[in-house]
Amino acid sequence: MESCFQGDSRKSYSLSELAEILGAAVRGDPAIRIRGVNSLEDALPDELSFITDVRYKPLLSKCRAAAIIVSPALAELEFPLLVAERPYVVFARAAQLFAEPPFLAPGVHPGAYIGPNVHLGEGVSVGPQAHIGEDCVVGPGTRIYGSAYLGPGVRVGENCMLYPGAVILDRCLLGNRVTVHSGTVVGSDGFGYAQDEKGRHVKIPQTGIVQIDDDVEIGANCTVDRATFGRTWVRRGAKIDNQVQIAHNVVIGEHAILVAQVGISGSTTLGSHVVLAGQVGVAGHIEIGDRARVGAKSGVHHSVGAGEDILGIPGVPAREWKRTYANIQRLARFREELRLLVEKVQRIEKALDGE
């Protein structure tokens, strides 16, 4: 099977070159040429693969890879190796060396719309039917694919990737190396209404912006609402999966991970390295501390301290939830034991009444 991480066929590295670039040690022939990366099962004779656990050693008997990335614990394998403390991280960086972004012709496609007072940096590529509104600034090396939309006054940094159909609405700010995938809308109105005396909903204009810092990646079909005032802020290095909703005035901390279908209500703040697993719901106006983790489908209704693990609906500390769940699993047994105990008490009472 052809590697999905194999780039330009002219791009290749020797094992020793990769070791130097990736900070790994070579075991075996340093002159081996590598032209891509792949899984153990599918790797071709000129590709690099990886193994992180001894459980996968049986796969090596059929592996055709030119070399394998391993941890020091597996450095004695009879195979050309790159040895690193964090083999999975090294594999990810190797994949980046070979991966090529989807093709986009350099320059501005004649079918794109470029508004007045737009500044495009050196090496910017703009695809067909893309729309770049007035007063936008786009940094060098950024790729704006077909049908992407930038509203008036948007600022986009260097080497960003805006995929087809990505929407960045007016005045929003993107840092450097930001990736926004198809169907995502950055800067839609926050959900803000006041109820009058007759129960009618009066819209509160959402006049703030969204600020996305360097090295953020946002998946497909996400929505990041603009602030009521000030900014909704996604801080440096955060990674956001598909179909995530981030409400107005939310702050996402540095290097946070938000897995698919997470929803975060307004004015909530996440610390750095927070992990929200799939379908987590977070109430508004609370704080989740640095390195806290919330398990899938949990509902968080109160602030969470740094380093806490949360599970369940409503979310509680993981140990408490596990104890509760274990007891739920025993309910049928408890019920039967209680029934027998009640019957025993009734027999004793009946015997006592007969004396």
Swiss-Prot record:
Q: Which superkingdom does the taxonomy of this entry point to?
A: Bacteria
Would you kindly state one Gene Ontology biological process term found in this protein's UniProt entry?
lipid A biosynthetic process
Outline what the protein does. Answer: Catalyzes the N-acylation of UDP-3-O-acylglucosamine using 3-hydroxyacyl-ACP as the acyl donor. Is involved in the biosynthesis of lipid A, a phosphorylated glycolipid that anchors the lipopolysaccharide to the outer membrane of the cell.
Q: Which GO terms describe its molecular function?
A: N-acyltransferase activity
Q: List the catalytic activities from the record.
A: a UDP-3-O-[(3R)-3-hydroxyacyl]-alpha-D-glucosamine + a (3R)-hydroxyacyl-[ACP] = a UDP-2-N,3-O-bis[(3R)-3-hydroxyacyl]-alpha-D-glucosamine + holo-[ACP] + H(+)
The record's comment on protein family reads: Belongs to the transferase hexapeptide repeat family. LpxD subfamily.
Taxonomic lineage per UniProt? Bacteria, Pseudomonadati, Thermodesulfobacteriota, Syntrophobacteria, Syntrophobacterales
- Key words, A-Z: Acyltransferase, Lipid A biosynthesis, Lipid biosynthesis, Lipid metabolism, Repeat, Transferase
**Self-association or partners: how does it assemble?**
Homotrimer.
Record-given protein name: UDP-3-O-acylglucosamine N-acyltransferase
The pathway where this protein functions is: Bacterial outer membrane biogenesis; LPS lipid A biosynthesis
**SUPFAM superfamilies associated with the record:** Trimeric LpxA-like enzymes (SSF51161)
Concerning HAMAP family, the annotation shows: LpxD
Report which gene this protein is encoded by. lpxD
Recorded GO CC terms: membrane
- List the EC numbers from the record: 2.3.1.191
Name the PANTHER family for this protein: UDP-3-O-ACYLGLUCOSAMINE N-ACYLTRANSFERASE, UDP-3-O-ACYLGLUCOSAMINE N-ACYLTRANSFERASE 1, MITOCHONDRIAL-RELATED
UniProt cross-references to Pfam families, sorted A to Z = Hexapep, LpxD
Active site, renumbered: 248 (proton acceptor)
